[in-house]
From Swiss-Prot:
Any GO BP: photosynthesis, dark reaction
Family of this protein: Belongs to the BchN/ChlN family.
Protein name: Light-independent protochlorophyllide reductase subunit N
GO molecular function, one term: 4 iron, 4 sulfur cluster binding
Catalysed reaction, written as an equation: chlorophyllide a + oxidized 2[4Fe-4S]-[ferredoxin] + 2 ADP + 2 phosphate = protochlorophyllide a + reduced 2[4Fe-4S]-[ferredoxin] + 2 ATP + 2 H2O
Designated gene of the protein: chlN-1
Taxonomy of the source species: Eukaryota, Viridiplantae, Streptophyta, Coleochaetophyceae, Coleochaetales
Assembly and binders: Protochlorophyllide reductase is composed of three subunits; ChlL, ChlN and ChlB. Forms a heterotetramer of two ChlB and two ChlN subunits.
Localization terms from the record: Plastid, Chloroplast
InterPro entries: LIPOR_BchN/ChlN (IPR050293), Nase/OxRdtase_comp1 (IPR000510), Protochl_reductN (IPR005970)
Cofactor, how bound (note): Binds 1 [4Fe-4S] cluster per heterodimer. The cluster is bound at the heterodimer interface by residues from both subunits.
Pfam families: Oxidored_nitro
The enzyme's E.C. designation: 1.3.7.7
């Protein structure tokens, strides 16, 4: 990270523990994004209960994920793990015939040292379906890092651009179409990584196309069979701040060139993201300032609500720095940015933009607390009395009972917040508790908790 940033940004690390949503929840959006995939979570009943509650399973929907439930025989090594997983995968092949099966490791597989990585290649050769192994245990990873481990594993399976270009692919194949596009470009191939809804990904593609930049592919792609070509000369750029492991894999293993840019969250972040990609390719960006100003003009009704209000990030989904930067630009005061894990190299451009935003808005730099201690945070909130706390679900009700308005951080993970046009959705989420409080005050209800009754001695 740049020394200029570290001189002004204050980083602290408290407990060293993660207080976040479980990372296996990445299955919720990844199985929908990769349409020909099947996700198999290898864990205990607790993992199954969590998935059922977090993902809202419908009985007749037959979603493309399942639980391989570990029993006493598995844990005590009385059963053959390989044979058990083989039976399950054969059943998946018979029922669904996916293009890829993704094994998701959990806390239990980590504790009992289950060798999923060792079993997968053998079983893959036997059943004829690619098996990708990703560890998403809550011991080592925070909430959204589950996606990071899956994409890092999938990056290893992407075809090599130099090998594919030498082969004579038929014109109808995905590989040849990608190569055809890249040959027409006036810039090196660009691959974007990060799982976004198709509509949002299309919006970002269109914004880059307006600057004469063609996107060669996405990781993950909508189909496993359409994974992008990777290799030397391919530029990659992330859209989410929690994908540091994927970025490292793309650089070290696949020899790609990483474009270190702020993340396209909010109009300011989206503009900076596009400008950085343009600068790497030597392209002069056109009309971005007007585009950004147009979006800000459309957000005035929300900005009037949040201007001057204070917010406290407890830390959960690793989107905290980007969201804080956007809210500071909207006129809010950020007291503290709690974050479970901070890769200062991968987020260097985002941190630089945060610093610049604070200087432009003439507000003090917020503290950035990595792996925050929740008890200490509650004490700090009691002193600061922020207008809003963005927190994990576990702390929302207790904080509300103490008179602090809250917003679940998990909602920002599942909402569409990337790009120019989705900035309104971020402010819609942020202002909802503030608008609710205003409505309650209009009704004369200033407290959501009854005062404690006084006992009269008999």
């Amino acid at each position: 990270m740049n020394s200029a940033i570290s001189d002004t940004l204050t980083f602290e690390c408290e407990t060293g523990n993660y207080h976040t949503f479980c990372p296996i929840s990445c299955v919720a959006w990844l199985y929908q994004k990769i349409e020909d995939s099947f996700f198999l979570v290898v864990g205990t009943k607790t993992c199954g209960y969590f998935l059922q509650n977090a993902l809202g399973v419908m009985i007749f929907a037959e979603p493309r994920y399942a639980m391989a439930e570990l029993e006493e025989g598995d844990i005590s090594a009385q059963l053959n793990d390989y044979q058990e997983l083989k039976n399950i995968c054969l059943q998946i092949k018979k029922d669904r015939n996916p293009s890829v099966i993704v094994w998701i490791g959990t806390c239990t597989t980590e504790i009992i040292k289950m060798d999923l990585e060792g079993m997968a290649p053998r079983l893959e050769a036997e059943i004829g379906i690619p098996i990708v192994v990703a560890r998403a245990n809550g011991l080592d990873y925070a909430f959204t890092q589950g996606e990071d481990t899956v994409l890092a594993a999938m990056a290893q399976r992407c075809p090599e651009i130099s090998v594919a270009s030498k082969q004579n692919q038929p014109m109808g194949s995905a590989f040849s179409q990608t190569l055809k596009v890249s040959n027409q470009q006036d810039h090196p191939p660009l691959v974007l990584f990060g799982s976004l809804p198709s509509t949002v990904a299309s919006q970002l593609d269109l914004e880059l196309k307006r600057q004469s930049i063609e996107v060669s592919g996405w990781l993950p792609s909508q189909r496993y069979t359409d994974l992008p070509l990777l290799g030397e000369g391919v530029h990659v750029c992330g859209v989410n701040p929690f994908l540091s492991r994927t970025a490292t894999t793309l650089m070290r293993r696949r020899k790609c060139k990483l474009i270190s840019a702020p993340f396209p969250i909010g109009p300011d972040g989206t503009r900076a993201w596009i400008e950085k990609i343009c600068s790497v390719f030597g392209i002069q960006p056109q009309g971005l300032e007007e585009r950004e100003n147009q979006i800000w003009d459309g957000l005035k009704d929300y900005i009037d609500l949040v201007r001057g209000k204070s917010v406290f990030f407890m830390g959960d989904n690793l989107l905290e720095v980007s969201l804080a930067r956007f809210l500071i630009r909207c006129g809010m005061v950020v007291y503290e940015i709690g974050i479970p894990y901070m890769d200062k190299r991968y987020q260097a451009a985002e941190l630089a933009l945060l610093q610049k935003t604070c200087q432009d808005m003439n507000v003090p730099m917020p503290r950035i607390v990595e792996k925050p201690d929740n008890y200490n945070q509650v004490q700090r909130m009691r002193e600061l009395q922020p207008d809003l706390a963005i927190t994990g679900m576990a702390h929302a009700n207790p904080l509300e009972a103490r008179g602090i308005s809250t917003k679940w951080s998990v909602e920002f993970t599942f909402a569409q917040i990337h790009g120019f046009t989705n900035a309104r959705d971020i402010l819609e989420l942020v202002t909802r508790p503030l608008r609710r409080n205003h409505s309650l005050q209009g009704l004369g209800w200033s407290s959501l908790v009854k005062e404690q009754n006084q006992l009269i001695p008999s």
